[in-house]
């Protein structure tokens, strides 16, 4: 089960007819829905929870668009999903162009199991994603970058270019609309 929050409302526009697709000003509804699911699963524990993924594109852009009080509320919900979600089958995937600590509550970022940085990372983004190895991070061309999984040493990676995006769109749409 995937919930897709597309703040810009552009990159995943092909998904707009899916019930778990949220764009622009409606992305808060997607976060709230997954947070409510987290609360429900914690109050009614079971061993057979269906895996749930909250995919949020442009978290920092979304935060910049809401008043400070709401920013803190959403940061708290995101921190709860990060810190408690894995235990009840809820996972988070965030994408943003500029990653820095102001987008998260203190300590929340340490709960990301996987960090992926692509292209020309700023020093702040490198510190945020790869704190202990930030000085080793160098700018990379498009599709090249760094990956850290569960605290293991950071490795350089290359992301293959998708030749036919329609196939990828179909796979995403099937997961969103199921």
Provide a role label for each language-model segment.
Residues 1-53, 60-121, 130, 137-139, ...:
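P-loop NTPase catalytic phosphate-binding loop
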Residues 6, 56-58, 120, 149-151, ...:
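Flexible glycine-/small-residue-rich
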Residues 124-178:
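Conserved P-loop NTPase
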């Amino acid at each position: 089960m995937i919930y897709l929050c597309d703040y810009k409302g552009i990159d995943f526009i092909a998904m707009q007819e899916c019930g778990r697709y949220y764009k622009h000003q409606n992305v808060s509804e997607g976060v709230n829905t997954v947070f409510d699911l987290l609360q429900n699963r914690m109050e009614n524990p079971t061993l057979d929870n269906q895996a749930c993924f909250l995919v949020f594109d442009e978290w920092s852009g979304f935060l910049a668009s809401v008043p400070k009080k709401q920013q803190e509320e959403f940061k708290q919900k995101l921190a709860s999903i990060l810190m408690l979600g894995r235990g009840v089958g809820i996972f988070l995937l965030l994408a943003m162009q500029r990653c820095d600590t102001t987008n998260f509550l203190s300590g929340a970022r340490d709960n990301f199991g996987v960090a992926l940085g692509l292209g020309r990372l700023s020093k702040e983004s490198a510190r945020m994603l790869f704190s202990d190895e930030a000085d080793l991070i160098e700018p990379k061309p498009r599709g090249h970058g760094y990956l850290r999984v569960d605290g293991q040493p950071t490795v350089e990676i290359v992301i293959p270019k998708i030749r036919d995006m329609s196939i990828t769109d179909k796979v995403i749409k099937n997961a969103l609309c199921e």
